[in-house]
């Protein structure tokens, strides 16, 4: 099996990006160690702080954020970083070639129940001139690398540099990432969907109708049985989609009119969309392709529909219908 280093060399990834990927990968090994030790290390539970999203921070949110921030500050290829747990961008150096956006511990609410969590990251080119928040506001198409690390029964790194999606598994004996899937591929059709059904009453009419038709199975207009899956961590649900197909969505809802969207564009939706597209899938908000969105702020949120290409298209067809004459759902 190829090591991560050997694989990056075989793909012709440049030295600077290779160095940055190794920094992220090596830090993920430390995070994996902290996650595995859980209560033994006293890292479970919540802090008394909230992040910029207004969400109560878990202890491991803060710990993993600091681990990544410190590691990236020590990497001379990094110009600046943005994190879910940081109110503002963090300037690292004036000569780095890259900007890094990350969610240090996606699904952190799962920590206390010993369920799946992960790290998501996006790498963008650093523009010349003075660094500011606007330096980070690049469409997803500008990403030069993206990936996630899944901390589950085994620790796995899914990575793209624009040459497909490679999956690496951390060997606990050697502490090295080894290539276990050379090219992840999402099937075009699927019989699985992932959505938080508890929000059903808050969805827009297109998503209400789409999910209702899936639930009708063989007796409904889709004439096909579907199974629902939900891990409550984007990193876990998207990993399943990349592994065996499916559609994952966190759609627009009116549960909180001030926050109609849940997932963050820069460090959740964009990197996952890059991975999904590189594996042959599609990613949309329901009305526009996610990686074509011009960001307006670092912590911007968007609706997300991604996964098997034909099923995403089917969902988008519902969003193109006229619901003006339908009764209130």
UniProtKB/Swiss-Prot annotation:
Main location: cytoplasm
EC code(s) of this entry: 3.1.3.11
Assigned protein family: Belongs to the FBPase class 1 family.
GO biological process assignments: fructose 1,6-bisphosphate metabolic process; fructose 6-phosphate metabolic process; fructose metabolic process; gluconeogenesis; sucrose biosynthetic process
Compartments reported by the entry: Cytoplasm
CDD domains in the record: FBPase
SUPFAM superfamilies from the UniProt entry: Carbohydrate phosphatase (SSF56655)
Catalytic activity: beta-D-fructose 1,6-bisphosphate + H2O = beta-D-fructose 6-phosphate + phosphate
Binding residues annotated for substrate, in chain numbering: 106-109, 196, 262
An MF annotation (GO) of this entry: magnesium ion binding
Pathway given in the UniProt record: Carbohydrate biosynthesis; gluconeogenesis
Protein known as: Fructose-1,6-bisphosphatase class 1
Keyword Zinc: no
InterPro entries, sorted: FBPase_C_dom, FBPase_class-1, FBPase_N, FBPtase
Entry keywords, A to Z: Carbohydrate metabolism, Cytoplasm, Hydrolase, Magnesium, Metal-binding
Domain of life: Bacteria
Residues annotated as binding Mg(2+) 2: 103, 106, 268
Binding locations of Mg(2+) 1: 84, 103, 105
Subunit text: Homotetramer.
Necessary cofactors: Mg(2+)
CC annotations in GO: cytosol
Cofactor note: Binds 2 magnesium ions per subunit.
